[in-house]
Amino acid sequence: AKVKNARSKDLADIFNNTASSKMSLDDILEFSYEIAIGNEKISLEEFNKLVEGSNGLIKYKNKYVLIDKEESKKIFEQIAKANFKSLSRMELIHASMSGQLDQYDFDYDAAFAKIIQDFTKPVDVNPPETLKGELRPYQMTGLKWLWTNVSKGFGACMADDMGLGKTIQVISLILKMKEEGLLTKPVLVICPTTLMGNWMKELQMFAPSVDAVIYHGTERKLDVKHDVILTTYAIMRIDVEELKKQTWGMIIVDEAQNIKNPDTAQTLAIKMLKSDIKIAMTGTPVENRLTELWSIFDFINQGYLGSLREFQKSYAIPIERFKENSRAAKLKMSISPFVLRRLKTDKHVISDLPEKMVLNEYCYLSKSQAVLYEKTLNEMMDKISGFTGINRRGNIFKLITALKQICNHPYQFLKS
């Protein structure tokens, strides 16, 4: 069966400029199925009659054609069920990148071809003039990768190894978009509380021209008249009703493994926020299950990997349960344009990084701690020796906890 594109709506200007590409990712592309034997197109009815009246060998216009009857029935049922189909541009790109279209003789028209061609074409960009610092070559590559995705209306997952400078690459993107006049609304950065100070420090160091504020604390008040607003996951979850009223110029989620569970209140809240551009930063896009990857993609490029149920059926179950390498390869291929993962141990990425130095620093117990530690250990070991089974295991765990508390501070164990 030959699948030919019949028509597409208003595709001539796809990706011609940043604004139109951002607004067009969910536009609908339309196509229809057609059947051909050789180069001769035939109707559905004629095809069905030929298949029904054959035992695998059919005669068509003085030619004999060998055909798989069962496969032909499947083709007929598929076409009869949905002779006219539609895809969003996001779905078309996923189908193309994952190889789903390879099973068909898919006849693209010029507009369809342009979508795929422009999508795979990198966009060059110069470093921002207002950046106070110099990007390493691999960081410049990261900026170009971010710029390519953002300029075509896609989100991205920056998954570089810790220490390669994910933050400065994303800050460079903010500066470049600001210089190009593409940021007319504030950028919202959501990160763990422990990283908020580091974000502010790096913004002040590398991007002093950016007006950044912290939205945190009991006296917080949302003021969107700033370039960048920094907040935490906890505050975002508490104030989601306020934050979702805004349409943000860009939303950046640092330590994105915090949204790996698709059903948690935190993840659901963050996906309520509105922005055309969403960036996830994480050194561990997948920690335990593939659905964690789906959850991050549902944030950066909603719909690209289908619904959660579709993803589980197409990828998670075949890969995790049945170890299907072909599915894993398809998934890797389909997500590769949107995930940048580089390791600092890779000399092709960075060759002048010194070897990791491990320095052991020992913290010694005070005299009172040492006495209490030994006394507690001896007393509880004598007690444990008289126990068996679950009682013994429970008391061993209790001893470990007690010794940890003493090492931290005797007060934590003594409670006085």
Enumerate the language-model features and the residues they cover:
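Long, charge-dense, solvent-exposed interaction surfaces that engage phosphate-rich ligands
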Residues: 328
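Accessory nucleic-acid engagement/destabilization modules that flank
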Residues: 1-114
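ASCE P-loop NTPase motor core, strongest for the SF2 helicase catalytic module
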Residues: 105-323, 332-353, 357-416
